[in-house]
């Protein structure tokens, strides 16, 4: 059982660490309630990249290549999409798998219509094309029941597994869990010095969509186990660690893609390309252990030059505006030729600007 005590002052943290070693804790309050947990929508490109880069520890570019292979092999739907919509065919795939492997009552179809205006209507979510999980797919390929355009590697199958489980879960009933929140009062030599909060799931009452997930998937849905506690229980504090954590951390690739998506920068077809280009041009580098991304000296110099001399043209607002104008053309809300003329005039003004001092 682990608990975290957040202290913003280093000296206080260090003195607290010394005090807590060998201390006692008493449970002073326990609250339990049954909660309903709903599945997440199926993957679109952004959420697939976030999950896959983190779970598979692969680059965004590599994940997109694996997805391209799966798509070309007819194993998943189109992987460059910002839609979570599920077609009737998709619902049928989920229904057939759920009825064959779980209780038919677990099937709870949802369309997951996207709310954003710019979402491409023709595309649906990223989903499997047949009611076969990764193990069944491996068997069918090995036995020749399915012919693929590429040799499926373990990475292909692991990505397929992520897509498959996320999709099938999205078409199943919510789960019901017994949730517990407990407050522990920490004592040193009989004197209360701190309070710790422990919360988590005691029991999954009705599994629902969690039947198709693995234990590694559950924390993403807020399902973390916690031991049953009662008021008056007394516990001994075991190992104590002091860890320094910053308020903000550098991006990893999954977080960078997530932030781009939230800010309206890039589209499903360009997320991985943008990240890959930053690496290829030497603007950023990645720390292997943590997979954090940092700017290089070259990247900082290029950013400084462009933001100083062409601030408006390379700003986040201009980028987002251009994306929205392109979406408007795609949706038939704006004329292609008119938007091209506007863009040409904007570019012309930049070209005619006097060269900045070196």
Curated annotation (Swiss-Prot):
Protein's GO biological process: DNA topological change
Names of the cofactor(s): Mg(2+)
Catalytic residue positions: 78 (o-(5'-phospho-dna)-tyrosine intermediate)
Taxonomy of the source species: Archaea, Methanobacteriati, Methanobacteriota, Methanomada group, Methanopyri
Subunit structure of this chain's protein: Heterodimer of an RgyrA and RgyrB subunit. The topoisomerase domain is shared between the two subunits.
Xref: InterPro entries: Reverse_gyrase, Topo_IA_cen, Topo_IA_cen_sub1, Topo_IA_cen_sub3, Topo_IA_core_domain, Topo_IA_DNA-bd_dom
Primary location group: cytoplasm
Compartments, record wording: Cytoplasm
Protein name: Reverse gyrase subunit A
GO molecular function per UniProt: DNA binding; DNA topoisomerase type II (double strand cut, ATP-hydrolyzing) activity; reverse gyrase activity
Something else known: Starts on a TTG codon. This enzyme is the only unique feature of hyperthermophilic bacteria/archaea known and seems to be essential for adaptation to life at high temperatures. It may play a role in stabilization of DNA at high temperatures.
E.C. number(s) listed in UniProt: 5.6.2.-
Transmembrane segments: none
């Amino acid at each position: 059982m682990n608990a975290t005590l957040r202290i913003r002052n280093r000296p206080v943290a260090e003195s607290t660490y010394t005090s807590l070693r060998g201390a006692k804790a008493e449970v002073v309050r326990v609250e339990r309630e049954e909660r309903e947990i709903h599945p997440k929508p199926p993957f679109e490109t952004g959420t697939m990249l976030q999950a896959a880069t983190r779970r598979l520890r692969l680059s965004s570019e590599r994940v997109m290549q694996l997805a391209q292979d799966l798509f070309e092999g007819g194993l998943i739907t189109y992987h460059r999409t910002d839609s979570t919509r599920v077609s009737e065919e998709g619902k049928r795939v989920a229904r057939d798998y759920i009825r064959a492997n779980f209780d038919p009552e677990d099937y709870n179809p949802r369309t997951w219509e996207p709310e954003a205006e710019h979402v491409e209507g023709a595309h649906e979510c990223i989903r499997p094309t047949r009611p076969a999980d990764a193990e069944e797919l491996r068997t069918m390929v090995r036995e020749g029941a399915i012919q693929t355009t590429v040799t499926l590697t373990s990475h292909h199958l692991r990505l397929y597994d992520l897509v498959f489980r996320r999709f099938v879960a999205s078409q199943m009933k919510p789960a019901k869990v017994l949730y517990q929140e407990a407050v522990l009062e920490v004592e040193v030599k009989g004197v209360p010095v701190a309070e710790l909060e422990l919360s988590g799931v005691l029991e999954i009452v009705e599994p629902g969509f969690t039947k198709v997930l693995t234990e590694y998937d559950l924390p993403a849905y807020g399902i973390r186990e916690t031991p049953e506690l009662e008021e008056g229980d007394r516990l001994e504090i075991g190992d104590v660690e002091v860890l320094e954590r910053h308020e903000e951390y550098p991006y990893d690739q999954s977080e960078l893609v997530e932030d781009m998506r939230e800010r309206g920068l890039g589209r499903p077809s360009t997320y991985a390309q943008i990240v890959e280009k930053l690496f290829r041009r030497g603007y950023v580098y990645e720390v292997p252990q943590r997979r954090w991304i940092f700017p290089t000296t070259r990247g900082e110099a290029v950013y400084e030059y462009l933001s100083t001399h062409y601030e408006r043209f390379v700003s986040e607002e201009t980028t987002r505006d251009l994306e929205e104008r392109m979406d408007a053309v795609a949706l038939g809300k704006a004329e292609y030729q008119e938007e091209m003329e506007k863009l040409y005039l904007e570019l012309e003004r930049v070209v005619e600007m006097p060269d900045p001092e070196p």
